[in-house]
Regions:
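Extreme N-terminal leader/activation tails
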Residues: 1-27, 103-106
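Intrinsic disorder/low-complexity segments
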Residues: 2-4, 23, 59, 80, ...
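N-terminal compositionally biased, intrinsically disordered segments and leader/signal-like regions
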Residues: 3-6, 33, 95
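Amphipathic alpha-helical oligomerization segments
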Residues: 8-20, 40-81
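Detector for intrinsically disordered, low-structure N-terminal pre-sequences
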Residues: 20, 24, 35, 53, ...
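Alpha-helical oligomerization interfaces
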Residues: 28, 32, 39-41, 46, ...
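A structural signal for well-ordered alpha-helices, especially hydrophobic packing surfaces
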Residues: 58, 94-97, 101
């Protein structure tokens, strides 16, 4: 049984985790993801639910960040597009979850 809602776990993870290298999840990063999302405490359905929520919420954060960047650029404001960081994080998080699903014999 988990100690927090999926949404709160994802918010906490957003504060504690950002990929250090694109396309690579270090052991330390995987441990952070595993612990914050309480992956070991989830049954198979809860594991799929948190994965779906990660994709949905990080996708929304990506869209919002990208829209803000484009709006700032249109206004002539010097801005850096950080939206891809959300996609990198989402990919890393789903990789860790999918690895757990695979270990449990679930479809990935």
């Amino acid at each position: 049984m988990t100690t927090k809602t999926d949404f709160h776990a994802i918010q906490e993870l957003r504060e504690k985790y950002a990929p250090k290298v694109r396309g690579i999840v270090s052991g330390e990063e995987a441990k952070t993801i595993y612990e914050v999302l309480e992956i070991d405490k989830r049954n198979n359905i809860e594991l799929q639910n948190i994965r779906d929520m990660v994709v949905m919420i990080y996708g929304q954060w990506f869209d919002k960040s990208r829209d803000q960047y484009l709006e700032d650029k249109k206004k002539g404001v010097q801005a850096v597009d950080k939206s891809a960081e959300y996609l990198d994080a989402m990919s890393a998080i789903t990789c860790v979850i999918d690895h757990e699903k695979f270990k449990r014999g679930m479809g990935v």
